[in-house]
């Protein structure tokens, strides 16, 4: 097996070499491990939730689609902050199976429609805003463009896409995203991106990046409009 140093130099992912298939395909075949992963991602959402909902006003969107939203922890917090909005939680069947309990716990289940599917195939239509938290950083550019292309197909003109990500800043100081950038590269041949890189990526799919909203946490909200 290649060393991590060689993986960094070549840009090839470790997990396919170790497990014989990409990370998310491997998780799909390992339900116990997938549960640990999904619970961990819910925990990561908890780190970002308060800062994201404090920094960004979701109340102007009637329908919010959480793409790759896992168990729905972020969507639940968004709907709590936007009491007149409704949500669509979209993720793989084995992932959203556990969502009703969490949504009920947070008293938003009656305002959420759960849709099963893969964002590589299609994304639910009808959203005013499409939220993707820690989705795009999991994928190299070609796959990221495919995902965002499906979001653009679902979204009408002037609708919004909101990427909640660790946006690499323009400084050399310590930043969490610089560590996860290396993790994404070694694990998935993916990476964290700067604001400029997100702007270029979004423009390839018919979005115009309008702003990057920093939060009190390391996460930022990259806002773009479908054109």
Annotate each PLM feature:
Residues 1-63:
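Conserved Class I S-adenosyl-L-methionine-dependent methyltransferase catalytic core
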Residues 53-54, 58-227:
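Alpha-helical subdomain
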């Amino acid at each position: 097996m290649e060393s991590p140093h060689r993986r960094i130099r070549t840009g090839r992912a470790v997990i396919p070499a170790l497990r014989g298939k990409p990370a998310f395909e491997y998780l799909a075949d390992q339900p116990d491990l997938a549960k640990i992963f999904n619970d961990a991602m819910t925990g990561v959402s908890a780190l970002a939730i308060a800062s994201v909902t404090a920094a960004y006003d979701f109340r102007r969107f009637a329908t919010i689609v959480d793409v790759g939203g896992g168990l729905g922890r972020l969507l639940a917090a968004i709907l709590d902050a936007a009491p007149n909005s409704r949500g669509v939680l979209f993720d793989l069947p084995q992932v959203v199976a556990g969502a009703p309990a969490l949504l009920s716990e947070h008293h938003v289940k009656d305002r959420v429609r759960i849709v099963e599917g893969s964002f590589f195939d299609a994304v639910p239509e009808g959203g005013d805003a499409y939220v993707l938290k820690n989705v795009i950083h999991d994928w190299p550019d070609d796959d990221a463009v495919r995902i965002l292309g499906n979001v653009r197909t679902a979204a009408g003109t002037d609708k919004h896409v909101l990427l909640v990500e660790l946006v690499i800043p323009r400084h050399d100081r310590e930043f969490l995203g610089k560590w996860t950038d290396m993790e994404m590269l070694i694990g998935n041949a993916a990476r964290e991106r700067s604001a400029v890189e997100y702007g270029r990526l979004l423009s390839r799919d018919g979005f115009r990046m309008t702003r990057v909203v920093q939060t009190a946490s390391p996460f930022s909200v990259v806002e773009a409009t479908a054109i």
